[in-house]
Amino acid sequence: KWFYLFAWLGVLVFGTWAFEKMLSQQKNPNQQVQTILTREGVKKVVLERNRYGHYVVNGWINDQLVELMVDTGASDVSIPETLAKSLQLKSGAPSTYMTANGPITAYRTRIDKMQIGDIVLNDVRASINPAVDDITVLVGMSFLKQIEFTQKGNQLILAK
């Protein structure tokens, strides 16, 4: 009798874990990206579009793992305030940004080191956004303009 109870409990726990992993992969199919090094020495990272049409990827800010979403419409890398505090980023001068939901005030900052795959940039301009509850960092043009990027089908190719 106890055996069946523990067996069903094990199936339930495993099923819940597998379902959560599947949902996580649907939101962020780029949890472990590979870097391709070309003969010319160019580093390329290929991102897969998620089921919602976005490019979400795990990356690093100042050697701390973060979730990133590519946003070519954003001027700067935009970091939610709660995450900026845990990354120990200093809040600078206020600046007004136009968003899809209207103007917001965010605070200028600099990221010492930002990394996607083996593509590493230093001293990246960013903003700390107090109006966002999420923990996903938007990768805006202050990062993207320093690399090459090409979108083909359901893939975004980053190169440096």
Map each language-model feature to its residues.
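Pepsin/retropepsin-fold aspartyl endopeptidases
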Residues: 1-67, 72-160
